[in-house]
Amino acid sequence: MTDRPERRLARRAFLRGAGGFALAIPFLPSLLGSRVAADASTSRRFVGVFSLNGQFEANWHPDMTGAATVAPNTLARSLTDIDGPISNIIGPQFDGLRDKITLLRGLDGLTESGHNRSFPLTASAHTEGGMERGSAPFFPYSVDAVLEHAPSFYATPPVLGAMRLSPMLRRYNGELRAGESFSWWTEDGVTTRLPVQSDAEVVFRQVFAGSEPSEGPDPNERRQLVIDRVKEDFDRLRTSPRLGGQDRERLSNYADHLRDLQTRLAAAGSVTCTGPDVAYLEDAEAMYTNHIDLLVAALACGITRVGTLFIKHVRADGEMAGFHSNSHLSGPEAERTSAGLNAFIATRVAELLTKMDAIVEPDGNTLLDNSLVLWGNELGDGGSHGQLDMPMLLAGSACGRLRTGVAIDYRSEEGVTWTNGGKRLGRPYSMLLTTAMAAMGLSHHEWELGDGPGFGDYQKLGHRYAKGGGWDRYADARREMLPHLWMG
């Protein structure tokens, strides 16, 4: 062990243990000195969260009574002005987050598609055959992958380019079914559907315990908490006179977070060598909590700056409870059923946001403030099974680049509809994704990977069913940011 671990730790952000074991820790600016710490830039993070089967309009969108016109075809209302729950889906669990979230309406996918699990981060339909047959999107790039490969986002290679989580329960004789990936990247003419992780224990071992799942650590090491494996280095750093009070608290909170997470995983029976607890493996709520805690820890300590989380389940017992079939129905009963099922998903999202907002970073902002979390869906209105009027919730301001605490409606004036008298049209959904990437510090040169400007699929421009000019007014606006959301 070195006599000056704090000098090395400040630069590399690792604690060392026996056998070369290394544990990443959060950035601790007090070890760098005031001048260097003041010059250190805050890293932005991006998280994409996805759910299925669309939303009923009556459930998702807030009351916009009293909304102000803030730009052409753009209305906005403060979320703090809404009495009671924001909506039937965005309920009391978001009350403490009202000034940190943004709800968007009037963003339309310009793609011909039904169920499309890759849409939220590609703005593209799948080629013939559908996703179930493994076909790629027409535009085979997802935002998370673009960020992972962007030099302006990762100036130096990260420990992990992105943490992609698709939690699945251990059913079917204890076997873990493979999760679904909605992330894509194309390089040298080869399109790849990027892998996801579905087992929290495997992710923990790979990222925090330093072992590959195929080999696994020694059984004694599997029972030992990772913090205990670096105890000497941890204690020396924690008691260092150079470590400031806020950084000491930050380090202790991080250690407590990992201890609690690893203890819960051990109780499930997979971190130790005992058999899994069947009741736990059917508890979707606990499963998502473990994956959320993994993601938050990885973002907080700089292991990665990009994450995705697929929330498939709608009940704690893991049953789907007719989630898909109900999306094809209409009327008050179907709306109530959908609200009840989506409440489970919304609570998981609120848990993620609340935990990110509880971590105070060296610049005084929270991890959530310095991030952009995008909760999207594969569909708009589930009944129509299309991508018009996508239900979108954003959280975090990406270090002040995006406006929060508001609901924004981008729908056009009356008469600009899908078919005569149909749904009012808004702006291209792809404008949200380019705004998100700009908020992460990218230039259009890094996301324009197709044949022209913009991002995603623009099949419906000029469509005969798009009345009143449809989206044609935005045909030349593919590099523009979403008004009122974008603060620069």
Q: Whereabouts are the PLM-identified features?
A:
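Ligand-binding pockets and gating/stacking loops
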Residues: T2-G488
